[in-house]
Amino acid sequence: MGYNRALRYSKHEGTTCVIDNQHYKSLGAVLKDVKHKKDRLREAEIEPVLDIADQYMVTEDPFRGPGKNVRITLFKECRRVEPDTLKLVCNWSGKEFLREMWTRFISEEFPITTDQQIMNMWFEIQVRPMQPNRCYKFTMQYALDAHPDYVPHDVIRAQDPYYIGPNNIERINLKKGFAFPLMCLQSVYNDNFETFFEDVLWPYFHRPLVYIGTTSSETEEILLEVSFLFKIKEFAPDVPLYTGPAY
């Protein structure tokens, strides 16, 4: 094969050609071969570790699992927190369960047309400082298995709290460990709103007692946003809503 100017710079990666009885290979193909060789060496080193790791099972984050996540914001409030103390976020006295708010949420997220099951529930709290340029961290303590008749204190002394996660958002898994049996939640909610939470929600999910504090040595004003996050499993309706040639 004679000399050809078109073969000086190959348009195809990894192609070879023969010019004056000499074999030529594109530089990109050579660099790719070096990269692939490094990848094969790295895979050979980690392969024994992966063989051992395949024998173990680890739990995944249930928040990122299958299902639809829906949120209801219970309240937003500004609180004053004293140093070296933790303040109760909510005592479940009733302001978290306003009928107008929950009725709108249930009717929008749990329609009658589909069967929906609550797979899991989280208590989410988001905290932000009210004053700018404040350098402190947020601390937190919570309890799940408190007795129903226990009256929590509004303020407790900070003893071995932990820091709230990234972006000042913390989620607490409230699932007790067994499945939530109800399928048509809106009809149950409409039938007995007064006893819905005590008879339907809390038997299957924990009612947390959450305390929030700061690492500041001064009294700080913080903004709390408290929400419930539901993971919902949806099922198709049993029968079509309409009958006719178009359906």
Swiss-Prot record:
Matching InterPro entries: Polyhedrin
What GO molecular function annotations does the UniProt record carry, in alphabetical order? structural molecule activity
Q: Note the superkingdom of the native organism.
A: Viruses
Keyword terms, alphabetized? Viral occlusion body
Extract one GO cellular component term from the record: viral occlusion body
Keyword Flavoprotein among UniProt keywords? no
As for family, the record states: Belongs to the polyhedrin family.
> What's the stated role of this polypeptide?
Component of the virus occlusion bodies, which are large proteinaceous structures, that protect the virus from the outside environment for extended periods until they are ingested by insect larvae.
Q: What is this protein called?
A: Granulin
Protein source organism = Pieris brassicae granulosis virus
